[in-house]
Amino acid sequence: KLDKKQTIKALLFVTYDALGNENGYVAAFIRGDRELNMTKLVNALNINEYAIEFADEEKMSKATGCVGGFTGPMHLHDCKIVVDSELPGLKNLCAGACETDHHYINMNYGRDYEGDIVVDIKTLKEGDACPICGAPVRHARGVEVGQIFKLGTKYSEPMKAYYKDENQQDKPIWMGCYGIGVSRTFQAIIDMPQNHDENGI
């Protein structure tokens, strides 16, 4: 049985423009035992979070040559290929052949396939090397006390909310949604050992 670490996993997406029209397909490839980090993928594509979703595989197949669970980085066309930065350093991997019930073995980056974008798009696991310092990553529970949603021009375009740039040209306002959880922030502070005892706060 083949170890998942020796396989390439494909995830297929469709992207949209600011008006909600389909704007091309994306095939993201990661090591078989890894999980995709959508935030990293969105940043790599330089698009907004709302501008991408999983593709209708049958529809995408007609346009790009992908085949459901048998999609690999070879024989794809008319789509952007994003390869996780871990894959180029791995040798002799197994990947889908874009043909039902068929796979390729001994796949190597550069010789057999390439990506339009090669960047870190995986979710780090406990024990993985930190991409900044190299130390093993350790997971810990946290409390979300704030959040940001990048809305881009999703609402400003249809609302015609424009501003004048330095050339006096109308440009859509880039919007965001920002939240701070005041009550949960206080709760998190109180939960810290130095901020409460058996008598309370």
Each language-model region and where it sits:
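Extended, low-hydrophobicity, polar/charged segments
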Residues: 1-185, 192-201
